[in-house]
UniProtKB/Swiss-Prot annotation:
Family as reported in the entry's similarity comment: Belongs to the TRAFAC class dynamin-like GTPase superfamily. Dynamin/Fzo/YdjA family.
Species of origin: Oncorhynchus masou
InterPro entries given in the database record: Dynamin, Dynamin_GTPase, Dynamin_N, G_DYNAMIN_dom, OPA1_C, P-loop_NTPase
Intramembrane segments: 782-792
Ranges per topology, Mitochondrial intermembrane: 116-781, 793-971
Record protein name field: Dynamin-like GTPase OPA1, mitochondrial
Residue segments, region G3 motif: 410-413
Enzyme Commission number: 3.6.5.5
Annotated GO CC locations: dendrite; microtubule; mitochondrial crista; mitochondrial intermembrane space; mitochondrial outer membrane
Transmembrane segments: 99-115
Segments forming domain Dynamin-type G: 297-572
Transit peptide: 1-89
Gene3D superfamilies noted in UniProt: P-loop containing nucleotide triphosphate hydrolases (3.40.50.300)
């Protein structure tokens, strides 16, 4: 290229020299271009005349050096002209090299491009509409955002780039990934270079599309992708929760099984040493559930808290328990059922229900609220519909430091009138519950009396019902602070606590204060208030009350001492009573059931459960041959009438084989699409039920205990009720039956003979039924009349004459159609009238129907007999009008359909339905096992009740003996 450039420069110099333009001059040497300076010194003859000519070929060149310019040819104008032209050409070259430098080109392009961009921006700006008129649409606060938002503060809050880089995981090298993709793309294009390849076409296709079309297509595809993604996400979420639900149901079912299988004998738990009061409370819990004729559960000591509604019973009990554990209401009945509270000393202040493992921390207000709510729920749950109170006992244990050991029962408060919303018998029910507990001769009655009301105005004093001696009653006067303020005569309080006002004597008299009446008061504040009141009270200061008769602390100590004294005096006597009860029950069992084990209701249920499951398992032992035989037989019994009456007989009335086959195909198709699959599944379901019942009946005969009959019958009925046949079975069965009925090719002679035999048996059965109907219509013949002394009725005589006349008509016209013409009916009626027989046309047609049916069946049997040797003609497709056996082919198709259907149903039964039925039986047994009421209803009898009583009495006696032993050790 340098040579070409030099040639261009020489041509330019020659042109300039030829025109004799310019003046000879020399520029300073120090300002020459280095290349020009080198050329100037090298080829200046006057300065260096002795230097030999330069040989460019011998010089070493590098990529950074410039090639030397060739010396121009000498001009014919002499030495001076040549020198002038040489200097002129170097000046022009220097000027061109300065002007054509790259930085000037780039700078000029940038200036021009910026100017063009500015013009374009101004043009676009002028094209936009003026939106200043719509500034009112934007709220004012938008314009003030820049003043309210402190960007510097926000930037300081945001983390630095180094901190974010520490938090982020190591990112991949995107530069390397880009280089790899570029390299892969170059390989693909290189490999596909010879022609218009698919890769090239795929890469160039988007370029040919218009931007508008591509934007629309991209928008459509993006919206569709979003919808698809949302649907997939919804399905994934639904499947996720479905799996979670199935897992929870499975876990719940497994836990139910564990609970059902858990009993005291099966799972050996570690024995935990229980306290004395816990052992005694456990005996009382068992007694509360034990309902026997001996009524011994009421003879063990306990403290019964009785009194009027809102007298402060619950408050006194809470002060003894040192926690606000009961739900409260202003004047409303809150205690709706008896609550047995077992108090004992422990390191932590906690409460727990008998049938629950949850501990309520009484030091936390949240647990206290939850405990009160749980007690209220249990009370409302125990109350039956239409009632206000319930006799069912709620068992609760409270442990804590400084709590006296005893068992208290809080009873519903006695009311004087029944208010709105209460049951009509609420007053009597409450009195009955209180009386039932107080009749226990060993019960300690804690009688609560409101001290703020007049003693004579008290509605009920249940403690008086136990006799004037009051040897089991402890009298408690509450709200003494209000009584001191309201009563003008303090001596009345002294008379009450000394037992002089009421006509009874009690074990002790106490006066307590249970707060100021606020529901939010804590136990500690109530205690402080009570102590402050009695310290400053005039009643105690003046000697009207003794120090040991005041405060709930003294009350709890006295009640506890009295309770344990009563327990020590009576518990051994009660243990002897239970021992006698056990002896009586065991004697009754030995005399009535000497060879039977003592199984209670739960044990009997487990035994019956195993027997039922064994009976269900026996269904899987039924042979396939037996299943298919009974299925085929029952299915044909169900569909035979439809096949004969609606398919075969109408098609047989046609005159040629083509019409016969067409009619048969149409009716078979309609039958298969609508009725046949339903009938087949009904038959299969009934067969499964019958086999299940048959196996249970057979198992029952083998020394079966009849006590399980009601349970087994209920399990069978409920399992069959829950069982639903597989929905997909009908569709597959319809296709199989349709394909079986479409086949007309009888391949061998045995199949042909089997079809003929099937047809003969079917037609003979129909002929027998028809003869029976005709005999009933016409009455007994002469032989039966003479031998059996039977006569015909007038109607039978008329039908007999009609039959004779119609038989003569059939003999004359053997190929008669199935229906009589009107003129034929008239002719028969006229002939009968000529013999003195009056007959109705409807009777003639009815008789004709049965006679023609018998005539047709007889002809069909004769034709069937002729077709025995027709298999050869059928196989060779001979056309013989006298031997067309299309009806044999029809019965072969029906028979084959029955065989295939029976086989299919048998597979569904053995592979699926028997297992599903077994699963249903297990679920029903599990549900029955959880329902105690249903078990009581299904497993009944004196034997069961006697075993239940024996088990309970033994358990009570064992626990009482263990309690007595621990009580003696404590002494």
């Amino acid at each position: 290229m340098l040579r070409v450039g030099r040639a261009v420069a020489c041509v330019a110099c020659n042109n300039l020299a030829s025109k004799n333009m310019g003046v000879r001059f020399r520029m300073p040497l120090q300002k020459l271009h280095p290349l020009s300076r080198a050329i100037h010194h090298r080829y200046n003859a006057s300065a260096n005349a002795q230097r030999p000519p330069h040989c460019s070929a011998a010089r070493h060149f590098t990529s950074m050096s410039r090639l030397p310019m060739r010396p121009p040819k000498p001009s014919p104008g002499g030495h001076g002209g040549w020198r002038y032209q040489q200097h002129r050409s170097f000046w022009m070259l220097r000027l061109a090299s300065r002007l054509l430098k790259l930085r000037y080109i780039v700078l000029g392009s940038a200036v021009g491009g910026g100017y063009t961009a500015k013009k374009t921006y101004e043009e676009w700006k002028d094209m936009l509409p003026d939106m200043s008129a719509y500034n009112w649409v934007i709220p004012d606060f938008v314009w003030e955002l820049s003043d309210q938002i402190d960007l510097d503060k926000l930037t300081k809050i945001l983390p630095e780039l180094e901190e974010i880089a520490k938090l982020l995981p190591e990112l991949p090298d995107f530069d390397k990934i880009g280089e790899n993709f570029t390299f892969l793309k170059s390989i693909l294009f290189t490999a596909e270079a010879p022609g218009d390849t698919p890769v090239k076409a795929a890469t160039e296709a988007p370029v040919t599309a218009t931007p508008e079309a591509s934007d629309k297509q991209f928008k459509k595809s993006s919206d569709k992708e979003k919808v698809d993604q949302l649907q997939e996400e919804l399905l994934r979420t639904q499947m996720k929760y479905q799996r979670m639900l199935e897992r929870l149901e499975k876990e719940n079912k497994d836990l139910r099984k564990v609970v059902l299988q858990k009993d005291e004998k099966g799972i050996h738990q570690r024995k935990i040493k229980k306290s004395l009061i816990d052992m005694y409370s456990e005996v009382l819990d068992i007694l509360s559930d034990f309902d026997s004729n001996y009524n011994t559960q009421d003879h063990l000591p306990r403290v019964v808290v009785v009194g009027d509604q809102s007298a402060g019973k619950t408050s006194v009990l809470e002060m003894i328990a040192q926690a606000r554990i009961f739900p409260r209401g202003s004047g409303e009945m809150m205690t709706r059922s008896p609550v047995k509270v077992t108090l004992s000393e422990g390191p932590h202040h906690v409460a727990m229900f008998k049938d629950s493992s949850r501990e309520f921390d009484l030091g936390k207000e949240e647990d206290l609220a939850a405990l009160r709510h749980e007690i209220e729920l249990r009370m409302r749950k125990s109350v039956k519909e239409g009632q206000t109170v319930s006799p069912e006992t709620i068992s609760l244990s409270v442990k804590g430091p400084g709590i006296q050991r005893m068992v208290l029962v809080d009873l519903p408060g006695v009311i004087s009138t029944v208010t709105a919303g209460m049951a009509a018998d609420t007053k009597e029910t409450i009195f009955s519950i209180s009386k039932n507990y107080m009749q226990n001769p060993n019960a300690i009655i804690l009688c609560i009396q409101d001290g703020s009301v007049d003693a004579e105005a008290d509605r009920h004093r249940p403690g008086q019902s136990n006799g004037p001696a009051g040897e089991r009653t402890i009298f408690v006067l509450t709200k003494v602070d209000l009584a001191e303020k309201n009563l003008a005569s303090p001596n009345r309080i002294q008379q009450i606590v000394e037992g002089k006002l009421f006509p009874m004597k009690a074990l002790g008299y106490f006066a307590v204060v249970t707060g100021k009446g606020s529901a939010g008061e804590s136990i500690d504040s109530i205690k402080d208030y009570e102590e402050d009141f009695f310290q400053n009270s005039r009643l105690l200061r003046d000697g009207m009350l003794k120090a040991h008769q005041v405060t709930t602390k003294n009350l709890s100590l006295a009640v506890s001492d009295c309770f344990w004294k009563m327990v020590r005096e009576s518990v051994e006597q009660q243990a002897d009573a239970f021992k006698a009860s056990r002896f009586n029950l065991e004697t009754e069992w030995k005399n009535n059931y000497p060879r039977l084990r003592e199984l209670d209701r739960n044990e009997l249920f487990e035994k019956a459960k195993n027997e039922i499951l064994d009976e269900v398992i026996s269904l899987s032992q039924v042979t396939p041959k037996h299943w298919e035989a009974i299925l085929q037989k029952k299915l044909w019994e169900r569909v035979s009438t439809h096949v004969i009456e609606n398919i075969y007989l109408p098609a047989a009335q046609t005159m040629n084989s083509g019409t016969f086959n067409t009619t048969v195909d149409i009716k078979l198709k309609q039958w298969t699409d609508k009725q046949l699959p339903h009938k087949a599944l009904e038959v299969a379901w009934e067969t499964l039920q019958e086999e299940f019942a048959r196996f249970m009946a057979e198992y029952k005969g083998k020394d079966q205990d009849d006590i399980f009959d009601k349970l087994k019958e209920a399990v069978k009925d409920e399992s069959i009720k829950r069982h639903k046949w597989n929905e997909r079975a009908m569709d597959s069965l319809r296709v199989i039956q349709h394909n079986a009925l479409e086949d007309r090719s009888i391949t061998d002679k045995p199949q042909w003979d089997a079809a003929i035999q099937f047809m003969e048996e079917t037609l003979q059965a129909r002929l027998k039924d028809t003869d029976s109907v005709i005999n009933d219509m016409v009455g007994p013949d002469w032989k039966q009349r003479w031998m059996s002394w039977k006569n015909r009725s007038p109607e039978q005589h008329t039908r007999n004459e009609t039959r004779n006349e119609l038989e003569r008509l059939l003999k004359l016209h053997e190929d008669h159609t199935a229906y009589l013409a009107n003129d034929e009916v008239t002719t028969v009626r006229k002939n009968l009238e000529g013999r003195g027989v009056e007959v109705d046309p409807a009777l003639i047609k009815d008789t004709w129907h049965q006679l023609y049916r018998r005539h047709f069946l007889q002809k069909a049997l004769q034709h069937c007999n002729l077709c025995r040797r027709g298999f050869y003609y059928y196989q060779r497709h001979f056309v013989d009008s006298e031997l067309e056996c299309n009806d044999v082919v029809l019965f072969w198709r029906i028979q084959r359909m029955l065989l295939i259907t029976a086989n299919t149903l048998r597979q569904q039964l053995t592979n699926t339905e028997v297992r599903r039925l077994e699963k249903n039986v297990k679920e029903v047994l599990e549900d029955f096992g959880e329902d105690n009421e249903r078990k009581v209803h299904l497993i009944t009898g004196r034997r069961v009740q006697l075993a239940e009583d024996l088990k309970k009495v033994r358990e009570i006696q064992e626990k009482l003996e263990a309690f007595i032993e621990a009580l003696h050790k404590e002494k």
